[in-house]
């Protein structure tokens, strides 16, 4: 009876990251397991039932086997067939592969959920950053407008206060003469306007003419009366 072909274990080794044990490979091949040092004959014999070439008899007190080892050695070689052990090993391997596939599916689903959560967190961070930038821009604009308005109000109040103080301040050295001279200069600029100095000159000339006329009239009367 031919054995089924041995499955390729390289994919399993790559997924698990470790090499498949030799005992599992031998069990899949249908080979008998290699006995360990403790399972061998302590007296150097072959472990069979013959007494000729063993160098030690089973009835000897120095080479007596424990009951568990003797029972296992008597039942293990002939109890199970290689075909049954091979099928049981394949079933165990398929079960482990199925569990491994399920774990990989669960890991992928978890990875997808984590990626979605990271995307949501990233979008939230970007929206918060945008809101902070917009708020900073609006605040800077409002502060600049309020600063310009305050500076304008301060300049207006300062100019009005300065003009009011200049009007009501008598310590600037102005007197009536300086004000009159200033008014005279303004009147010179206006055509046809007579200044107080012009009026004074007019009144002086009229008085002189009147006095001259009064002095001339008696002379005429005296001359008239003389000739008469």
Curated annotation (Swiss-Prot):
One of its GO terms (biological process) is positive regulation of canonical NF-kappaB signal transduction. Residues 8-21, 28-42 have a biased composition (Basic and acidic residues). It comes from the Eukaryota. Residues 1-89 are annotated as: Disordered. InterPro entries: LURA1/LRA25, LURAP1. The modification N-acetylmethionine is found at residue 1. Residues 57-88 have a biased composition (Low complexity). The keyword Acetylation applies. Keywords: Acetylation. Pfam families: LURAP (PF14854). Residues 44-56 have a biased composition (Gly residues). The keyword Oxidoreductase does not apply. This is Leucine rich adaptor protein 1-like. It comes from Homo sapiens.
């Amino acid at each position: 009876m031919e054995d089924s072909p041995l499955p390729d274990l390289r994919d399993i080794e790559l997924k698990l990251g470790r090499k498949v044990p030799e005992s599992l490979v031998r069990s899949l091949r249908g080979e008998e397991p290699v006995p360990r040092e403790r399972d061998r004959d302590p007296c150097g014999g072959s472990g069979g039932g013959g007494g000729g070439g063993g160098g030690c008899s089973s009835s000897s007190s120095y080479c007596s086997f424990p009951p568990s080892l003797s029972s296992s050695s008597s039942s293990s070689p002939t109890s199970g067939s290689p075909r049954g052990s091979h099928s049981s090993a394949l079933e165990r391997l398929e079960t482990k592969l199925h569990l491994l596939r399920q774990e990989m599916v669960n890991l992928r689903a978890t990875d997808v959920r984590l990626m979605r959560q990271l995307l949501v967190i990233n979008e939230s961070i970007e929206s918060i950053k945008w809101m902070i930038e917009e708020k900073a821009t609006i605040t800077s604009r409002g502060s600049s407008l309020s600063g310009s308005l305050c500076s304008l109000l301060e300049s207006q109040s300062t100019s009005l206060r300065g003009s009011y103080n200049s009007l009501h301040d008598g310590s600037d050295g102005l007197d009536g003469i300086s004000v009159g001279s200033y008014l005279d200069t303004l009147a010179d600029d206006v055509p046809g306007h007579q200044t107080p100095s012009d009026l004074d000159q007019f009144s002086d000339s009229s008085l002189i003419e009147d006095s001259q006329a009064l002095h001339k009239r008696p002379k005429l009367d005296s001359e008239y009366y003389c000739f008469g």
